[in-house]
A protein has these predicted regions:
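Specific transmembrane alpha-helical segments of multi-pass solute transporters/efflux pumps
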Residues: 1-21, 57, 145-163
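Hydrophobic alpha-helical transmembrane segments of multi-pass integral membrane proteins
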Residues: 45-57, 74-81, 89-147, 174, ...
Length: 219
């Protein structure tokens, strides 16, 4: 699921990518319920709907006409594949337990993930685009490896140990909230009313999902 968003971004829009990726927690819930018997109650369902609405409010900037004008491309299929891939990865982390601690386990996953992508990298390097190995390149690679890589994946794995696959999946809806506020902080975008509405709805949905008396463990 790591390479798919980059492929999707070549032919589809950020709005489409954001909307489609919000389906990932839904796939986590469906797969967990169908194949692993994890129960899903009514309040968790309302939490899911509330999160979805909150994310959509931010993505479409509070303007419903954004949805009417959407056009879909092959990139949307790549993004759908990324959403399903993340769902499968999340379920794998939770249901296939490992004797290894979090960091050694992540190291092995990252190693074999990089190994599986190596042939595709070589094909791209030879036939399409040569990588320029300079200071700028190594700075961005280091940032990608440390922040969204080691830190984010490790914390996500730790959260799953305590909350389960489907409940932890709801934290993905925070990405849209964080992304909006990063745009305000780093790119001088304006804070609008829809940011407040969407953020409140997302946090309300996550609160409903994570209430201890609403979480039903795998039967």
């Amino acid at each position: 699921c790591g390479a798919f968003p980059f492929l999707a971004g070549q032919t589809t829009t950020i709005v489409n990518m954001g909307i489609i990726y919000t389906s990932s927690p839904i796939f986590i819930i469906l797969i967990s319920a169908i194949f692993f018997g994890e129960k899903f109650n009514l309040i968790k369902f309302f939490g899911l709907i509330t999160c979805l609405i909150g994310v959509l409010v931010i993505i479409i900037r509070g303007d419903i006409s954004f949805l009417i004008g959407l056009k879909f491309t092959i990139g949307d299929l790549w993004m759908l594949g990324a959403a399903i891939g993340w769902a499968l990865y999340s379920i794998y982390l939770y249901y296939w337990k490992s004797q290894l601690p979090v960091f050694p386990r992540f190291t092995l996953i990252a190693f074999f993930g990089a190994l599986s992508l190596l042939p595709f990298y070589l094909i791209e390097e030879v036939n399409f685009q040569n990588t320029e190995f300079n200071t700028y390149f190594f700075l961005w690679v280091s940032f990608a490896a440390l922040s969204p890589g080691i830190i984010a994946f490790s914390l996500y794995t730790l959260a799953q140990k305590h909350l389960g696959a489907s409940t932890t999946g709801f934290t993905l809806y925070l990405f849209t909230v964080y992304g909006a506020f990063y745009g305000i902080i780093f790119f001088e975008e304006q804070l609008e009313f829809y940011h407040y509405v969407g953020t409140i709805l997302v946090f309300l949905g996550i609160y409903l999902v994570k209430k201890k008396n609403n979480y039903v463990a795998k039967s």
